Amino acid sequence: LILFTIRIPDHAILILSKDKKKFKPKLIIIEIKNQNVSGSVDEKLWAGIAIKKNYQYWLENFDIEYVFILSTYLYNLVIGNKKKYNGLSKLLSDSNIKIFYGNDINHFENIYNLIINNSK
């Protein structure tokens, strides 16, 4: 895909259907973000909405699913009460951007289920 010369995600999973009338190909983009103290990585979470739209623009023949896997610090920011992040969780949810906690004991199972559920 030519877009990957512009953007290189941490992981990309392409799901094809034998029945092309059933649904168009799906591309799951997985971005892993790690931050342990305040800094600039958290800004990439806000940018996720625009980045997903960029993928949708360039890959209009694909369904795009965008996922963040977050470190403990970032995950707590997104689900916490800090004023700066009050709307972030809602904006990501409204944009259908999923958030996974990287240290979750079921981390790999959650990703596996995401792939399986998108393969149906």
Language model: regions and residue ranges:
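Active-site metal-binding core of divalent-cation-utilizing nuclease and nuclease-like domains
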Residues: 1-23
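Context-gated lysine
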Residues: 18-26, 33, 44, 52-53, ...
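Catalytic cores of nucleic-acid endonucleases
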Residues: 23-28, 34-78
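Domain-level recognition of nuclease-like catalytic cores that cleave nucleotide substrates
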Residues: 63-120
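Catalytic phosphate/metal-binding cores of nucleic-acid and nucleotide-processing enzymes, i.e., regions
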Residues: 5-6, 32, 38-43, 54-58, ...
